[in-house]
Amino acid sequence: MARCAQGCDPPIVALRCAIVDDKPEFLEAARNLLERQGVAVVGLVSSAADAVERVQELAPDVTLVDVDLGGASGFELARRLPDTQVILISAYDEEDFAELVAESPAAGFLSKPQLSRRAISDLLSRR
């Protein structure tokens, strides 16, 4: 196999992602969608109580965190993950959470229908 000379594109590295959501059906749907787009989904977490420890163990490039975790706040979870790039997600539009998103340490916000590798990469590239 020939080696690449100067000017070659670097190999594409899969984006490593964890997803935190209290709805198992969304976790599976999001994993399937993102994996078809080349994202390596390294973990699915269904409770805020387990999220900090699991995300620290998994060390993903980005963690998608639902805003409403069934009694727990995705905004609070983002604060508890200072060494992790967090993107907040919700079935609702960003306008519903604009002030909270702006005040949070999260990299940004995506509505669940907008979820894609490209949307995630676009948010991360703005940081």
Where are these regions (language model features)?
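Two-component/phosphorelay signaling modules centered on CheY-like receiver
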Residues: 24-43
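Acidic di-acidic motifs
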Residues: 21-22, 47
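As written
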Residues: 101-108
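Non-catalytic signal-transmission and effector/linker regions of two-component phosphorelay proteins
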Residues: 1-16, 115-127
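Active-site residues of response regulator receiver
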Residues: 21, 66, 90
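Acidic catalytic/metal-coordinating carboxylates
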Residues: 47-50, 68-76
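Acidic, metal-coordinating helix/loop segments flanking the phosphotransfer/catalytic sites
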Residues: 44-62
